[in-house]
């Protein structure tokens, strides 16, 4: 383990002390939150995920990198049960959500799945905010309508999140009145309002606007400091290198390399080295 690791805060780089890194490792080496074993997924004749296995520990930040079309987003959608798997096992805190039976993937009953789904949050690449809802309405809608939280409690949660994410003056704004970075922060607030144990990000900085990319990366860094368990699909190689506890490289539906940032970026196999070199030159 290195003595210090650079981290992202806004558009600047800072250093994370050895003590801070050790604290992160102490948190992550205990409880397994999410476990996926031998996951398979096909769309028609196209095999998108081929025998993928992944475990995520409490407080861990896992970055998933790789070329477009490698199955990264599909992996996230299977983990959050937005897509049904065709094979393999999915469990959270040891409770099985899906498993193989007689060569087919079987899911738990609706009541069990509803409870398990409460543990996951997904921040979409394109925000997916309701355009006809205000920022406040976007954030409180799911807690009230899905989880049965009172409107008062949902608003209290929302105000705390808006303040935390620097959006307290945008509660009554509509998505079209916000910048890309602000919309993505609202999307993060909406996911956090459900109080998930694991937060998934699908290309959170895909728009390549340096100003709002810095805004979003700063929020993710803040969540990491608070030991939020996160799985992040990203093309931001420097970000993945600096912030992650573990990095996974995927290509053609397979995990080609997995390890700490030091292992993946410091000693990549030939294919990973080629990919990293090409992406970091862009």
Regions found by a protein language model. Give the residues of each.
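H-loop/switch region of ABC-family ATPase nucleotide-binding domains
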Residues: 234-235
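The feature captures the beta-strand-to-loop junction immediately N-terminal to the Walker
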Residues: 65-67
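Catalytic Walker B motif of ABC-type/P-loop ATPase nucleotide-binding domains
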Residues: 199-202
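ABC ATPase "signature
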Residues: 258-259
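Conserved ABC ATPase "signature" C-loop
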Residues: 252-253
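Conserved ABC ATPase signature
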Residues: 174-178, 182
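A short, proline-enriched helix->beta-strand linker immediately N-terminal to the Walker B motif
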Residues: 193-197
């Amino acid at each position: 383990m290195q003595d210090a690791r650079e981290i992202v805060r806004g558009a600047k780089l800072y250093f994370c002390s050895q003590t801070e890194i050790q604290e992160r490792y102490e948190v992550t080496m205990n409880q397994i939150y999410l476990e996926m074993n031998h996951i398979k997924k096909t769309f028609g004749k196209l095999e998108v995920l081929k025998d993928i296995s992944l475990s995520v520990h409490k407080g861990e930040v896992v970055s998933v990198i790789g070329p477009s079309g490698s199955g990264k987003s599909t992996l996230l959608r299977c983990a959050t049960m937005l897509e049904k798997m065709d094979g393999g096992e999915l469990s959270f805190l040891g409770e099985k959500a899906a498993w193989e039976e007689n060569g087919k993937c079987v899911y738990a009953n609706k009541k069990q799945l509803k409870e398990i789904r409460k543990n996951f949050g997904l921040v979409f690449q394109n925000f997916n905010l309701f355009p006809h809802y205000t920022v406040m309405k976007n954030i409180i809608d799911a807690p009230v309508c899905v989880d049965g939280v009172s409107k008062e409690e949902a608003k209290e949660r929302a105000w705390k999140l808006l303040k935390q994410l620097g959006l307290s003056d945008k509660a009554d704004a509509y998505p079209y009145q916000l910048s890309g970075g602000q919309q993505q922060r609202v999307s993060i607030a909406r996911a956090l309002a459900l109080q998930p144990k694991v937060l998934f990000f699908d290309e959170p900085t895909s728009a390549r606007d340096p100003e709002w990319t810095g805004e979003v990366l700063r929020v993710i860094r803040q969540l990491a400091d608070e030991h939020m368990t996160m799985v992040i699909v990203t093309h931001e190689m420097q970000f993945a290198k600096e912030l992650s506890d573990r990095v996974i490289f995927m290509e053609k539906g397979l995990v080609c390399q997995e390890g700490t940032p030091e292992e993946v970026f410091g000693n990549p196999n030939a294919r990973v080295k080629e990919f990293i070199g090409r992406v970091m030159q862009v």
